[in-house]
């Protein structure tokens, strides 16, 4: 692993990837040197959102337009993302953490080990309590699974106890957590996971 940590954030459209990246930037930017690469198919929407939200200085945020399958841009041919990361690392050699947010994708999405050191996979309760048991690399092999939007469970009829049971069965000893990123609930668990992974932490 390099002296800086490259962290991938993946998950389906609308699961809360950008919300997680924003929350991590806000909590960590005073203590760590950060940069972000976002992926969108035809726009730079997520990069623009993070800039407007003031998550980081604009020069530390790069938006990548993949122009096609978001999975390909982080796995099979991640050269456009590698170039964006390399550009940020050259501009800011003191970086501690580079966050790479994938475009919204399905449960089969996974990052190339050439691009990131670790991956957080984000799903949301609103997609249904069956999602953890459907499996896929994001569910079973990500370094941390984040189950977001737990506040919506009553509205969508999702059973959090069942999601917990299925998650434990599918992931074994791999870490996971419930979050409500809108309120910040569960964010401390994500931060604790990261603090264990950062070099020199």
Curated annotation (Swiss-Prot):
Record keywords: Chaperone, Cytoplasm, GTP-binding, Nickel insertion, Nucleotide-binding
InterPro entries reported for this sequence: CobW/HypB/UreG_nucleotide-bd, P-loop_NTPase, UreG
Subcellular location: Cytoplasm
Residues given in the record as GTP binding sites: 11-18
Bilayer-crossing regions: none
MF terms (GO), sorted A to Z: GTP binding; GTPase activity; nickel cation binding
GO cellular component: cytoplasm
One Pfam family linked to the record: cobW
Keyword set includes Protease: no
Cited function: Facilitates the functional incorporation of the urease nickel metallocenter. This process requires GTP hydrolysis, probably effectuated by UreG.
Subunit structure, as described in the record: Homodimer. UreD, UreF and UreG form a complex that acts as a GTP-hydrolysis-dependent molecular chaperone, activating the urease apoprotein by helping to assemble the nickel containing metallocenter of UreC. The UreE protein probably delivers the nickel.
Stated name of the protein: Urease accessory protein UreG
Organism: Synechococcus sp. (strain CC9605)
Gene that this polypeptide is encoded by: ureG
């Amino acid at each position: 692993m390099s002296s800086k940590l490259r962290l991938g954030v993946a998950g389906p459209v609308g699961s809360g990837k950008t919300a997680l990246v924003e929350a991590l930037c806000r909590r960590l930017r005073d203590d760590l040197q950060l940069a972000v690469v976002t992926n969108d198919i035809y726009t730079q929407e997520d990069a623009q959102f993070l800039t407007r939200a003031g998550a980081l200085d604009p020069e530390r945020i790069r938006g990548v337009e993949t122009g096609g399958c978001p999975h390909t841009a982080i796995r099979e041919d991640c050269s456009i993302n590698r170039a964006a990361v390399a550009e940020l690392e050259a501009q800011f050699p003191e970086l501690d953490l580079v966050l790479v947010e994938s475009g919204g994708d399905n449960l089969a999405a996974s990052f190339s080990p050439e691009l990131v050191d670790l991956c957080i996979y984000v799903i949301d309760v609103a997609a249904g309590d069956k999602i953890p048991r459907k499996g896929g690399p994001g569910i079973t092999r990500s370094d941390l699974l984040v189950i977001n939007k737990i506040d919506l469970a009553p509205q969508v009829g999702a059973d959090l106890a069942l999601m917990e049971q299925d998650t434990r069965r599918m992931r074994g000893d791999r870490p996971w957590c419930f979050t409500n990123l809108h309120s910040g609930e569960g964010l401390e668990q994500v931060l604790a996971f990261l603090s264990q992974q950062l070099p020199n932490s």
